[in-house]
Amino acid sequence: MSLVGGFPHHPVVHHEGYPFAAAAAAAAAAAASRCSHEENPYFHGWLIGHPEMSPPDYSMALSYSPEYASGAAGLDHSHYGGVPPGAGPPGLGGPRPVKRRGTANRKERRRTQSINSAFAELRECIPNVPADTKLSKIKTLRLATSYIAYLMDLLAKDDQNGEAEAFKAEIKKTDVKEEKRKKELNEILKSTVSSNDKKTKGRTGWPQHVWALELKQ
């Protein structure tokens, strides 16, 4: 019985019919000398107490050894043109970060909702809007600026009899078409105010023909 392996074994007998047995045993002994007892104790015990092996058995044992398997894995990557794990550039080895589009979509929805709510509040401030009229954002802005100009004109006429001067905001002239539209609107407003001397109480109304002029734009 062997003291190292713990199993009974036969003494090593060299047969002349297997000329590769001596070379295989020498290669196995050289491999065992490179390995420590702590790393591979089973292989060391097997090397001391193993029976004589034939060349086919020895080739089969090498195919199942860890060193041979690791070497074969490396050869397999190089054979198929692949790159072993961790051998590529440092920035390309890990998984690609996934873009979080959900957060961007939620921010965009909140921004759109805030803009729509602001335009809805602005439409409520414009008087005499027909119920069947659907105003776009650009028409809402145009009507709002026209209504502001209308209110400023009323305030200027009311302050002519007072001591303090009315506050006037200067608006830059953009183009000829816009200037012409403002002149027509001012003429219509002047004719409307001159025909109606009574001052309206509460919310100031807006004539319907002004709406007709604005909606044609």
Curated annotation (Swiss-Prot):
It comes from Mus musculus (Mouse). InterPro entries: bHLH_dom, E-box_TF_Regulators, HLH_DNA-bd_sf. This is Heart- and neural crest derivatives-expressed protein 2. Gene3D superfamilies: Helix-loop-helix DNA-binding domain. Residues 97-112 have a biased composition (Basic residues). The lineage of its organism: Eukaryota, Metazoa, Chordata, Craniata, Vertebrata. The keyword Iron does not apply. Residues 76-116 are annotated as: Disordered. Disulfide bonds: none annotated. Efficient DNA binding requires dimerization with another bHLH protein. Forms homodimers and heterodimers with TCF3 gene products E12 and E47, HAND1 and HEY1, HEY2 and HEYL (hairy-related transcription factors). Residues 99-151 form the bHLH domain. It is found in: Nucleus. Residues 83-94 have a biased composition (Gly residues). Keywords: Angiogenesis, Developmental protein, Differentiation, DNA-binding, Nucleus, Transcription, Transcription regulation.
